């Protein structure tokens, strides 16, 4: 294969922490929402949130109330929390910096490869944010919660006609990795030095600066077939 040709026919990105530096924005929002319950609860909320990137905020709300507050969250309360969370984060995510290398990659590759987004952010909000950041034209499709990553990836496989081993999921959380394994697609982790959550053998980059080189290198990405 020519070194100028990518080893994949479609790329799927998580959003927060992979394309945009927005993880801290959402961490602060969770902390603010649970601040009335005290410092210890806030610490538990933040730790669980950071350990479960890519999980829907609504799943997190339910877990936090059940595990840390000892009660079941009502549907009305869940909707209210979701609205408050969106109000805290949406403008900040729109204004957030790019992950290093992300904008350059999207600009340089969107006409060469079909690119997709699979996020734990509610889909309507995700589409608004991507639109207001001027990113819509980069992607063939954008999908978010309430669907899980595995289901989204299977949908993208069906839409694109790309074989599983020729689709690459790029994510920064085990939720992304697990979704890739479930859908049978290849995976690349994004993790800063010293903060790699992925199993041994999974390739990792610190950001997207070297992603173009990765795509045309002979070194393979993690394949879900290796788990079987």
Predicted regions span which residues?
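Short, acidic loop-to-helix structural element flanking the phosphoryl-transfer center
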Residues: 7, 87-117, 123-127, 150-151
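N-terminal helical cap/lid subdomain that shapes the substrate entry/recognition surface
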Residues: 5-15, 19-100
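Asp-based, Mg2+/Mn2+-dependent phosphohydrolase catalytic module
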Residues: 1-8, 123, 127-228
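Active-site nucleophile and cofactor-binding loops and adjacent substrate-binding regions
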Residues: 51, 119, 146
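Short beta->alpha linker loops
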Residues: 25, 56, 97, 101, ...
């Amino acid at each position: 294969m020519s070194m100028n040709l990518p080893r994949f026919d479609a790329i799927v990105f998580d959003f927060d922490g992979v394309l945009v530096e927005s993880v801290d924005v959402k961490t602060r929002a969770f902390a603010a929402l649970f601040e009335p319950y005290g410092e210890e609860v806030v610490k538990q909320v933040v730790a669980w949130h950071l350990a479960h990137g890519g999980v829907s905020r609504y799943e997190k709300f339910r877990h936090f109330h059940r595990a840390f507050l000892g009660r079941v969250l009502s549907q009305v309360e869940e909707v209210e929390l979701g609205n408050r969370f969106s109000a805290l984060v949406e403008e900040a995510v729109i204004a957030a910096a790019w992950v290093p290398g992300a904008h350059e990659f999207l600009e340089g590759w969107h006409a060469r490869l079909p690119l997709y987004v699979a996020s734990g952010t509610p889909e309507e909000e995700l589409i608004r944010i991507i639109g207001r950041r001027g990113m819509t034209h980069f992607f063939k499709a954008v999908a978010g919660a309430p669907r899980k990553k595995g289901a989204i990836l299977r949908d993208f496989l069906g839409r694109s006609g790309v074989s599983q081993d020729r689709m690459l999921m790029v994510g920064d959380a085990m939720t992304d990795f697990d979704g890739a394994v479930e859908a049978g697609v290849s995976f690349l982790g994004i993790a800063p030095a010293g903060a790699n959550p992925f199993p041994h053998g999974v390739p990792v980059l610190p950001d997207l600066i070297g992603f173009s080189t990765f795509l045309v290198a002979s070194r393979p990405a993690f394949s879900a077939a290796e788990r079987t």
